[in-house]
Amino acid sequence: MKLRLLVLAAALAASGAQHAQAAPRGFTVEDLVKMERVGSPLLSPDASKVVYTVRTTNMDKNRGNTQLWMLDLRAAKPAPVRLTQADASSTDPEWSPAGDAVYFLSARSGSNQVWRLPLSGGEAARVTDLPVDVENFRLSPQGDRLAMSLAVFRDCADLACSKARVEAQAKDKATGKVYDRLFVRHWDTWKDGRNNVLYSAPIDAAGKVSAAPVSLSGTIDGDVPSKPFGDHEEYQFSPDGKTVVFSARVAGKTEAWSTNFDLYSVPATGGAPRNLTAENPAWDTKAQFSPDGKTLAYTAMQRPTFEADRFHLVLMDVATGKKRALTGAWDRSVSDYRWAPDGKSLLATADDVGQHRLFSIDAASGKASAVSGLGYVSAFSVARDTVVMAQASLAAGAQLYKFKLGAPSKADKLTNVNEAALADVRFGEYEQFSFKGANGDTVYGHVMKPWNAQPGQKYPIAFLVHGGPQGSFGNSWSYRWNPQVYAGAGYATVFIDFHGSTGYGQAFTDSISGDWGGKPLEDLKKGMEAAAAKFPWLDRERSCALGASYGGYMMNWIEGNWSDGFKCIVNHDGVFDIRGMAYSTEEIWFTEWEYGGPYYKAVESHEKFNPVHHVAKWKTPMLVIQGDLDFRIPTAQALGTFTALQRQGVDSKLLVFPDENHWVLKPANSVQWHHTVLDWLNTYTRK
């Protein structure tokens, strides 16, 4: 397909004229699910171009579709060029070393394979044609080799064997599955015996992978990258292309209660992996070589089995293996990071007091300095002296911005996705506030006005409680829990980063473990009252509480321990019985850390804040929602909640999605979810 410049001037002018005449309106869930989603910016090696993804939503097909776009940054006003167009998505872009082609993943041929699109024109050509799907990949710095993850049976001699076994399983009339160790299921998928195995293969003169891929991690009983959310950030080529470093957890019988990921080094052509971090029993991951190849950076935790421990940056001398903690004194947890091209600093994102900022970290001293302002930086890329980042806020989905290293205050906006479609939408105004919470600590939260707020008026409250529990409900844009949907429906919203939230120092994050119903509930109570006192447009007498996951747990806890707090409650995938949760969730390292061990060794701590003991006090109307593919907080928890409500005659409804997991992701289901929730709120706050 020839590259085509998207020419929309006339259409946008007409659209702008129509929107100029349209009356302002509130934001709706239909707006939310139809929004185009910008992500994965990647600068070309010479920083002259950036390729990125845009996901659109087809409501008729009830699914999203992701394609690649490009901006030429040399232009005075860069215009978006669409690179790919197919019924199948195109994702995971990688630049060729010369910047003359883009590699990407697509299932346009029927299976997920690597493709190459020359920027000089012409159609995309398939680089791999393997019997199994390519899950993710990296291109070597020289462009002559791929590292890629494939889902295979480790005891198979070749890829064809794995394909044949999957096909045989599908045809087998007997459907029973036999397990002799955990995991038996993970997130939303039953285990079928396959592992993510890292392979390497050369690219021949014709631009194809013609030789059989060589396993790099197959001798390790584990997944590379990790399941369920790992990606190519968990493995990396060295600058000379001769070595691959990857992160893996040896599974064995302890996989379900271990977070001991180690870094392994292996020749890119195959060989025995060498453990680089055997001394650390906690999590080591996301290795990246410095530009000169002499230093290996990676993120590491210190406490085994604690998934919310602080990720700090470690630098390892490649020649000697000597390590030093770079950000040990910085009380923030590193999310994503990249080396600056000169090797003197690293760029990293981290939660920070209700924001998710981009920081520059000095490679010698470890000093961190913020280079982005308010908002949420979801992705970024750096090449030469240029940085491109995707940044969102509570008032807008992600857009791309460009700035020069050393001059972050002069960021240029590169994209205007969704702005024409939402030109007549008036978003709710929001503000961060603080108050004295549990232990007299400063706690932060946000409030948001309805889109049509008027002076002197009061508005019902949607009180949103985040999950995690080690997370943050800050200045970001969500396609699942978005306060603007409630603002668009006439509600004020209040959301608190209670004790246990991230971005306020590790001690604050740690403080929730073993205290799920203690300090967090106190913070929520004090935060609600502080907000009501500070913002007179909040109608405290007409409020409903909503939460998912840990937030759903908190809905059950509020039901029995703050029973006069709200007119109604919405509980999505929430914990009802902590004992049942401990024995049925899949990642049991989580519950064992939070409660000090397995249930049979720590009964008292599990039961201390167990909602099931307080159901006799339940009286607030509750909407219970559950995804039946949620193996993190299984369906039995929602059924227990609903049964307790119904048996006592408490007004209640149960909404179940048979085809959703812990999150509601399908567009039509998201619309149904929001309309059901808003109807529930309207029933009890509009009386």
Give the role of each language-model region.
Residues 47-50, 102, 146, 244, ...:
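Hydrophobic beta-strand positions that form the internal "hydrophobic ladder"
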Residues 482, 487-488, 495-687:
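Active-site-proximal cap/loop segments of hydrolase catalytic domains
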Residues 45-46, 97-98, 141-142, 239-240, ...:
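Residue-level detector of Asp-centered blade-edge/turn motifs that repeat once per structural unit
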Residues 456-467:
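Short beta-strand element of the alpha/beta-hydrolase
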Residues 54-67, 83-91, 105-115, 123, ...:
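A flexible loop/linker signature enriched in serine peptidases of the S9 family
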Residues 73-76, 118-122, 203-207, 267-271, ...:
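Short loop/turn segments that connect beta-strands within beta-propeller blades
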Residues 42, 147-149, 175-180, 184-203, ...:
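Non-catalytic accessory segments flanking enzyme active sites
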